[in-house]
Amino acid sequence: MNESPDEVTKEVIRDMGKVRVHITTSLDGYVAGPNQSEKEPLGEGGERLHEWRDFLGLEGGNQNASDIVIAEERANVGAEIMGRGMFGPPTRGPWGDDPWRGWWGDDPPFHKPVFVLTHHEREPLILSDTTFTFVSDGIESALRRARESAGDEDVFIGGGADIINQFLAAGLVDEVELHVAPILLGGGARLFDGVGRDVTLEELRAIAAPRVAHLKYRVVH
């Protein structure tokens, strides 16, 4: 039986390396609180999601389990994809004459090519050793470009929730790691909304650490 072009594309993509999601979520499934704004980019109460990171690299050179998880997360990543909501600002529409340059200042922490999904075209933005390329023709195009940049390394889907959900629904993710914080947000940007019931996750590991549980899954295709 002949495969469709989309199926062939997915197989070629997987041969090049993994597509990985790593994201912090509340117990009720939110990766950001309600009413995200420039003042509160993670929404109301969303900053509590990342309190577990305060425990990383304890004084005296001690480590906890989260240090090991984060080191593994950052290894072998050649490119990253994010949505406009993660790049910012929270407002939408055309970029304008003096477009937003991201939340991270002139030296972003990525140090690799980043592809930003947006509905509005924009020229690439170079800040230090990070190049932001703005992609307006869909997630498959963004992944194809990220793969070309990453080579044999993995592609990291950074967020937000809507972008991750689109990639999961399209069957384009190989691994998902959830950093589950012991809080409830009650609303906001929710992971897995609209993904459907056909996505099967196989547990790879579960690690408990201060203020967080790290749950890693393989997406069964």
PLM regions: where:
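Enzymes that bind and transform nitrogen-containing heteroaromatic metabolites
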Residues: 2-221
